[in-house]
């Protein structure tokens, strides 16, 4: 799997959320809760994955422009309700 992102967007994300997109691939190495982002019409399917990174529950928003590529849009710490859902999902 190949990962790509807009470097300017990565810089903004790093300043805002403290996460670098270069670490995002590690979230995909572990189980995630994944939902289709239907909040807005982006002209493409955007996915919201909730998973683990360095012992923290995080949310990664991404798209799959083709079968071999994941484009990272955002990476941030999970909100309380997102963390609880993730923990409940993988409780057993």
Task: Say what each PLM segment does.
Residues 1-92:
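Ribonuclease/tRNase effector modules and their secretory precursors
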């Amino acid at each position: 799997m190949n990962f790509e992102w807009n470097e300017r967007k990565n810089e903004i994300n790093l300043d805002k959320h403290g996460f670098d997109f270069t670490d995002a691939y590690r979230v995909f190495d572990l189980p995630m809760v994944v939902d289709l982002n239907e909040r807005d019409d982006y002209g493409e399917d955007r996915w919201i994955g909730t998973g683990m990174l360095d012992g923290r529950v995080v949310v990664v928003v991404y798209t799959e422009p083709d079968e071999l590529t994941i484009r990272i849009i955002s990476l941030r710490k999970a909100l309380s309700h997102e963390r609880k859902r993730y923990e409940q999902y993988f409780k057993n």
